Amino acid sequence: MAGIFAITNYTADREILVSYFINSLQMLQHRGKAYWKIIIDNLVSSGIGPFPAESSIPKSDNDNSNLRYMIGLGYLSKRIPRFRSMNKIGVVLDGFFVDIEKLHLHPLVGDAANADSLYKIYCIFKKLLIDQGNAEKACEFLDRHLRGNLTMMYDGKIYSYRDSTGFKPLVSGTDKNNSVSIIASENSLRIPFPNMNFEDVRPGQLIKMDVENGQQKILSLPTTRTMIDPFEFIRESHVTATINGKGIYETRKRIGKVQADFLSTHSNIDIDAAYAEPDYPRPMNLGFSAEYRNHIPKFDLGEAIINDRYDDSDRMIDFSENISKNKMITSGKSLKYILKHKISQKNIGLIQGTIQTGITAKETIYYLRKVGVKSVSVIVSYVPSVDGRQVGLYTHNRELIAHKYIGQVPSLEELNTRISKELGANKVFYNSPSILSKGIGISEYNLWFPEWVRFLEYEKK
């Protein structure tokens, strides 16, 4: 394992920063570390063996003219870094990574897909934390893969995270004059700096340091998680179930309401009416329609459904939805169906609970077009289904239509476009984890999603 530390000097005195680096490195080398590396702003120095004198600290023409920020990182280990990317990025690691085999498929990995694991994690973490400004999701991502501590220096700021298991110690402190702050993975640094007020960084905590704002605790993830299957709120929950004091029916209406609010504001959706297919997304349709009408007053508040596969008169439905004849809008076999004159030459929204294999959606779209609709937009209450565990293995057909796009699309917009072409729809709008969790009323952190789905979001927000 390694020893890591980060130092921020709030004064313009370079010598103070250098002295803290020297003392930190020398103290940590007593633990038998052989390889050392220091980064002060954009200046880098490294070596193997005992740490030499101050002359090995990176110089800037003996002044501070090229130092934009009085901050830096230190790293010590018994061996040279495992990851070559440490030579080009401002990241130090004390610990190891887990479950990294499929990181190259992550929707946010971008051009780092073929890089080493540290660089992949650095790029995704930076994109979530810096580019998207989502500290909670950034820390959740790290927590999936990090066992230990990771510290990153970027644009004059230090970010240090301790994973929620508390696998490795991490301390932070500021001197009594509020002139220097330190984050370190070794408790032994308390010895050379008796004037520092050190305290333990809690597991799951993200610390930020910069010269303008000092040391800040940005976020603390819960150390325990109650993971809930979000599919329960789409289909499987018992009708008497409650969440946050509300019945499951009201929760499902809210899922539709939140999705309508998002799509009407942040997408190019254009529909005149929306209908559920089959029966179980009807609450989502009611919530969706009521909210959508707040944005589009002429929207038709129809409560009919396109197809009721749960009509007990059709016993075949209990055995195979692929074999049974779906009772579509023109058949009249269902007690609930919409009439041709209600939808002809209109832009119709098709509210689906999920899209699994796509068979149901394709057939419904076929019949809608047959009766003369102007366009069909498929609105999916659930997130993309790419794993049988997401739908309780409800279908024995494992060829989930979205599965082949894992690692192929960086955003929900692109996935929507590809799936719409496969289904023959004009448009498709999947729900996203963040929008779905808002509708359910439970933090994304406590809902279970496969990693690729968890970080697949809409770009335009």
Residue ranges and their predicted role:
Residues 268-280, 377, 428-431:
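Short glycine-rich phosphate-binding loop at a beta-alpha junction
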Residues 207, 259, 274, 284-288, ...:
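Conserved hydrophobic/aromatic pocket- or pore-lining residues that grip, position, or stack substrates
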Residues 290-348, 386-397:
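Short, glycine/charge-rich flexible loops or terminal/linker lids adjacent to PRPP-binding catalytic cores
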Residues 261-262, 273, 328-366, 404-423:
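Phosphate/diphosphate-binding loops
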Residues 157-158, 162, 179, 196-198, ...:
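PRPP-dependent phosphoribosyltransferase catalytic core
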Residues 118-122, 296-314, 422-438:
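A conserved beta-strand->alpha-helix junction
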Residues 14, 167-168, 190-191, 215-216, ...:
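Flexible loop/turn segments at secondary-structure boundaries
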Residues 1-202, 208-272, 277, 344:
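Conserved short alpha-helical segments that host acidic/polar catalytic motifs at enzyme active sites
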